[in-house]
Amino acid sequence: MKKAIATVLLLAAVLTPVTTASAENDTWISEEAQEQCITYGEEYGICPELLMAIIEQESSGQAYAENGSCKGLMQVSEKWHKDRMERLGVTDIFEGNVLVGTDYLAELFAENDDLYWVLMAYNGGVDYANRMYEAEKYSKYAVSIANRSAELERLHGK
């Protein structure tokens, strides 16, 4: 009897799918977040896979992640983006997180079209990005996200 129960449990464990990355999209962020990345990516002219890579890095796809004053999928700080939120009509930082983060990225791309500079500025601020850029260095954060974005693009046939 114990052997039969153990066999059933083993089979159940083996046959139960493990949820990691979506087989279709190769990312573990929610379908809703992926749809937002596509929608806002198209609206702002930013690669959706870049937005997905940022979300994976910043919050591991957890919509209600918090780290100090940074919140949500893209770890946006209400303190630093209050005016942006008002302009965009965002009243809940968790609900409008991808929109606010994408709008900020678009602003950074308008200032400097170098992907690594933009990612360093997003993560550490413009002054930090300028110092790193002038020293001809890229942060591990920027390189990691750029690589993951490129990987997602390849997986999506781009």
Regions flagged by a language model, labelled:
Residues K2-Q36, Y40-Y44, G61-Q62, K79-K158:
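Non-catalytic cell-wall polysaccharide-engagement segments
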Residues A33, I46-K71, V76:
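Secreted/periplasmic proteins that engage bacterial cell-wall peptidoglycan
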